[in-house]
């Protein structure tokens, strides 16, 4: 909602998610109905961003995905291998990040990004039209000797607009440059700092939980010696 309000009349508004923009699928768990409710709200929020022309992206630091590696494996497969692809992994252990950021001969130079690819997943049917999921890899390092490859997830409405894609690319690099030798979007870094819970806040939450547990007739055990020692140190954040 804040992004939508800010976007009115603004030249470009970009929102970042720490991690994939695909909501993790918990359908096989007993909380499937809860997940479905969250998914509907999430898709509605994404639709709101799309309708208000707002750029959004998920930033994955040090990704371990091997989606492109899997495509390479398909090119190596024989007709016999194709009959049992789940067991055909000649490049097992190789990640997309290694391919794009291999130190001696990285495919991506400082500040460069890959082509945009479509994302196939079990939940792709939920992300239709402008919400369909895509991704690209980007080298956020400014040092040729030390590539830093990240994956960026984006929806179709960003993919289809070259200007949005370029603005996002530039914004990611600008944010990562702020962090110097450890490139990472500064906005996400600040969000992590702000989200830290102080010792006092943690104790307040603990008290609320204990009161609710007592109200329901539950028993509250003593703190472990380890936790008591931690609390006695007066730590200010967790």
Segments predicted by a language model, with ranges:
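Long, contiguous domain-sized segments
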Residues: 1-12, 19-29, 33-238
């Amino acid at each position: 909602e804040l992004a939508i309000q800010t976007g009115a009349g603004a030249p470009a508004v970009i929102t970042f998610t720490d991690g994939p923009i695909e909501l993790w699928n918990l359908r096989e768990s007993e909380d499937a109905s809860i997940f479905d409710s969250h998914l509907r709200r999430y898709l509605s929020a994404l639709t709101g961003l799309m309708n208000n022309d707002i750029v959004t992206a998920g930033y994955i630091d040090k990704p371990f995905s091997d989606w492109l590696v899997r495509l390479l494996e398909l090119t190596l497969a024989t007709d016999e291998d194709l009959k049992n692809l789940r067991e055909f992994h000649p490049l097992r252990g190789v990640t997309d990040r290694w391919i794009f950021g291999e130190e001696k001969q990285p495919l991506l130079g400082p500040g460069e990004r890959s082509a945009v690819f479509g994302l196939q997943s079990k939940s792709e049917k939920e992300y239709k039209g402008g919400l369909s999921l895509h991704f690209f890899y980007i080298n956020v390092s400014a040092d040729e000797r030390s590539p830093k490859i990240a994956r960026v997830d984006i929806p179709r409405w960003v993919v289809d607009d070259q200007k949005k894609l370029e603005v996002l690319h530039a914004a990611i690099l600008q944010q990562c440059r702020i962090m110097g030798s450890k490139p990472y979007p500064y906005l996400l870094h600040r969000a992590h700092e702000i989200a830290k819970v102080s010792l006092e806040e943690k104790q307040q939450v603990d008290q609320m939980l204990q009161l609710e547990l007592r109200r329901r007739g539950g028993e509250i055990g003593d703190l472990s010696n380890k936790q008591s020692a931690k609390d006695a140190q007066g730590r200010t954040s967790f």
